[in-house]
From Swiss-Prot:
Biological processes, Gene Ontology terms: nitrogen fixation
Family from the record: Belongs to the NifZ family.
Entry keywords, A to Z: Nitrogen fixation
Taxonomic placement: Bacteria, Pseudomonadati, Pseudomonadota, Alphaproteobacteria, Rhodobacterales
InterPro entries named among the record's database cross-references: Nitrogenase_MoFe_mat_NifZ
Identification of the protein by name: Probable NifZ protein
C-alpha cells in the first residue's frame, strides 16, 4: 500500500482537544517505550479514564494523543 492510498489524518482537525475526557477501548501493553515498566506490562486497561494532555504528529500523517491516565499515574501516547 502506498502513502497515496491512505488517508492523511492531519489534513483535517484532530478528533480530540487537550482537556477532553477519553476512555480506553482496549488494553495497552508497554512496547518498551515507557520507562518504569517492563516490556509487556499492562499500562492501560480497557475502560480506564484519561484526559488528552497534548497532541502530536507521527510520520507527518497521523495524530498522536498524549493521554494522562491520572489514576494509573502514567501518560501514554495513543
Amino acid at each position: 500500500m502506498s502513502t497515496d492510498d491512505r488517508e492523511i489524518e492531519v489534513y483535517r482537525a484532530p478528533v480530540y482537544r487537550p482537556g477532553d475526557k477519553v476512555i480506553a477501548r482496549k488494553q495497552v501493553k508497554n512496547d518498551g517505550t515507557m520507562a518504569g515498566f517492563e516490556i509487556g506490562d499492562i499500562v492501560v486497561k480497557k475502560g480506564d479514564v484519561g484526559y488528552v494532555r497534548d497532541i502530536g504528529v507521527f510520520l507527518s500523517q497521523f495524530y498522536i494523543y498524549a493521554i494522562d491516565f491520572i489514576e494509573r499515574g502514567s501518560i501514554v501516547g495513543m
